[in-house]
Amino acid sequence: MRPKLGKTRKKNKYPAKKVSATVKHDDFYISENNRLTYSYKLDVKNKIAEVTCVSLDIKIQDEWMTIVYYDSYHEGQLHRHPRISYFDPSDAPTMFGVKRKGSQNKLLRWAIKDIENNWLVYKQGFIKRSNISNNNTDIPEIELY
C-alpha cells in the first residue's frame, strides 16, 4: 500500500519581481508668483495608490514657500496642512472642509481643484496670520497676485 502524500506546491521557476511604486510629479503656474505642485504614487497597475502632495507655493524674494498642502499619508485619508505663518514653518493638519470619501484619483483631482479655486483665500489667510503690513520691515513684501 502506498502512503498518501499531501499536495505539494510547485516552486515558481520565476519568482515575482519586487516593483516599487512610481512617483509622478507636476506643477503649473497660477500666476507669476503662485504655483500649484502635485505628486502621487502609482501602483503596479498604474492606478493612483497615494496622494503624496498637492501644494500651493508662493514666491517671496525669489524663493518658493509652501503655504498649504494636501496629502493622504495617514490612513489613506486626505487632509490639509496650512503653514502657520511666515515666521513659523510648522503646520496645523486638519480635515475640516476636506473631501473624505472616494478613490485616491478622485481625492487628487479634488485637492487640485480646491487649490485652483481657493488659492487667493489661502494666500490672504497666510498673509494675515503672518501679520504682514507695509510698516513691518522684517517681512519682505508679498505680491497678492
Write out the residue ranges for each language-model feature.
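A short, structured beta-strand/loop element
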Residues: 48, 52-93
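A short, terminal or domain-edge coil/loop segment
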Residues: 2-6, 19-20, 77-83, 121-132
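Negatively charged, low-complexity tracts enriched in Asp/Glu with abundant Ser/Thr
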Residues: 1-61
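Mature extracytoplasmic or otherwise solvent-exposed domains
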Residues: 35, 39-41, 55-56, 60, ...
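Acidic, low-complexity intrinsically disordered segments
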Residues: 91-140
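Intrinsically disordered, low-complexity regions
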Residues: 2, 20, 46, 81-84, ...
